[in-house]
């Protein structure tokens, strides 16, 4: 039976590539993002089954997502918390309070909200997989990336704690930690590209691999580097 998969930030980058990978795997794919026009275009391109606009930083939107999934499908098998972004990449002293709050909300709070929203459903099912997308900034940091790195480190450690809470219910929680890849986020941050760097499809394959493991097996976290990287992924 096809799995029901929900992916946030699915209009581009990792999210869009992940939606395509699950769809090609024969799963039923729900795609969400803020920009409905871009989302609908991406959904048509990859053959997604359902698309709806949502703000992952708004808990009420998560409540509506749970309601929609429950009414249409009755369950959720895989949740991919992919939505995120830099908001601002600069020295901490240059951040406004609003930019700090926005960075933490988009990259950390959104993941917590998503896992909280679908936790009860997956507990009742006694199965399910939550996959949260972090960043290598969770493991090491560089000047101007401090606030973003703090949020992504939070995602990594939140995922570890969430797994311990969900494990007794046969629900898996994993964290994927990607290096820089060829996405819109990279371009917006002014990061150069190389022929050997990661592609969104590489992260999508990693996410799909984790989800395809037998329910008895769980990947706690996995870091994916491009072969062109050594110590500094940027």
Sequence positions of predicted segments:
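Active-site helix of classical SDR
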Residues: 115, 151
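Conserved glycine-rich Rossmann-like NAD(P)H-binding loop of the short-chain dehydrogenase/reductase
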Residues: 25-41
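Conserved glycine-rich cofactor-binding loop
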Residues: 11-12
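C-terminal helical subdomain
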Residues: 168-171, 175-176, 183, 192-232
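Substrate-binding pocket helix/loop in short-chain dehydrogenase/reductase
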Residues: 90-92, 99-104
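The beta1-alpha1 cofactor-binding region of Rossmann-like NAD(H)/NADP(H)-dependent oxidoreductases
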Residues: 54-64, 97
């Amino acid at each position: 039976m096809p799995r029901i998969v929900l992916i946030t930030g699915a209009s581009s980058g990792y999210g869009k590539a992940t939606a395509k990978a699950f769809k090609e795997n024969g799963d039923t794919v729900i795609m969400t993002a803020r920009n409905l026009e871009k989302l609908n275009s991406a959904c048509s391109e990859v053959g997604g089954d359902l698309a709806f606009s949502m703000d992952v930083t708004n808990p009420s939107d998560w409540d509506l997502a749970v309601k929609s999934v429950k009414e249409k499908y009755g369950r959720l098998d895989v949740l991919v918390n992919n939505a995120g972004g830099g908001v601002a990449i600069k020295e901490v002293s240059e951040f406004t309070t609003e930019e700090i709050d926005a960075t933490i909300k988009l990259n950390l709070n959104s993941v917590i909200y998503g896992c909280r929203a679908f936790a009860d459903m997956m507990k009742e099912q006694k199965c399910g997989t939550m996959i949260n997308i972090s960043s290598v900034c969770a493991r090491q940091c560089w000047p101007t990336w401090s606030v973003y790195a703090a949020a992504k480190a939070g995602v990594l450690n939140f995922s570890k704690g969430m797994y311990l809470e969900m494990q007794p219910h046969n629900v898996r929680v994993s964290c994927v930690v990607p290096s820089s890849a060829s996405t819109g986020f990279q371009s917006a941050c002014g990061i150069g590209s190389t022929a050997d760097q990661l592609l969104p499809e590489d992260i999508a394959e990693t996410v799909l691999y984790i989800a395809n493991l037998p329910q008895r097996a769980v990947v706690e976290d996995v870091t994916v580097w491009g072969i062109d990287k050594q110590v500094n992924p940027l």
